[in-house]
Amino acid sequence: GGMVPVLAGLYVGGAESCSSPEALSAAGVVAVLTVDAEEPPAVPGVRAMHVRARDEPGADLLSRLDECAAFLAAARAGGGAALVRCHAGVSRSVAVVAAYLMKTQGLGCEEALAAVRAAKPDAQVNPGFQGQLELYEAMGCSVDTSSVLYKRYRLEMLSERFSEPQDLPREVFAVDPTTICQTLNTEVLYRCRKCRRALFRSSSILSHMEGMGPTAFAHKRITDSARLSGNSQEKCTSYFIEPVQWMEPALLGVMEGQLLCPKCMSKLGSFSWRGDQCSCGRWVTPAFQIHKSRVDEVRTLPIGNFLTAKT
């Protein structure tokens, strides 16, 4: 668990790497980033950042990778060194260092992991972190919370965390389109075919690859899902979308159920945190599906504010 240099001014290590303040100052370490379930005691005169995570495939490092990189870059920019540490110095700290190399040195996921292994042969990230690093690479090494890839990842992580969903974090819900003004919007709007209530926008559609098998997510390789097909899937009879604010009452405390129009209560589709199969054969987890036959597409014309329904 001692400190091992990966780059000039960047060290990786385990729990013991901070046991000697003398060793830290001898190495010029001015900042320590700890990725562990518990926050360690502070070392005097050393900047500290803590990311709470266990070494489990279901732990989320991805959403914190940009913050981690900024913290490490700031320490090194001032001429000091930074140490990234976890308990064993094998998986969590290695994943964060690899992400930093990807973002700052332009390395791909495999190259970055190989670079850390060259310095520390026992380095071995768990399969969940491997998938998160691939996803980070697919997003151009910056966490884009509006991207389809990230939205799907976040929902997948949520679905694995609970057997009975209680309260869902606000950020997983798309804003109800009835609450936003319609002008200057190039997005397509989807509304209930029966009562015309606006339900969701095209940016909420989480497209998937056609065909058999599960969608590739955190624990699997995501290289497939990076090559997403567009929304022109002929074989798919449903739209799979992110949750929208109006669905919240239906989702509380249950694993699956129907999705009804909040205005006229006609059946639009269904949801399941365990996942559901699309008509094209692809298994999607979790699934929030709206039958295409139950909604109309509305395109906003760039001139003025007239809505034109696609017949």
Model-identified regions with their sequence ranges:
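Glycine-rich, flexible N-terminal cofactor/catalytic loop recognition
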Residues: 2-39
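Short polar/charged helix/loop
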Residues: 18-22, 37-42, 47-78, 103
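Conserved tryptophan-centered aromatic signature that marks the ligand-binding surface of SH3
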Residues: 31, 270-277
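PTP/DSP superfamily signal
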Residues: 66-81, 98-240, 244-256, 272, ...
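Glycine-rich nucleophile elbow surrounding the catalytic serine of serine-hydrolase chemistry
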Residues: 90-96
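Short functional micro-motifs and their immediate structural scaffolds
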Residues: 91, 200, 269, 283-286
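Short cysteine-rich clusters marking metal-coordination/redox-active sites
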Residues: 192-195, 260-264, 277-280
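Cys/His-rich Zn2+-binding "zinc-finger" mini-domains, especially FYVE domains
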Residues: 251-267
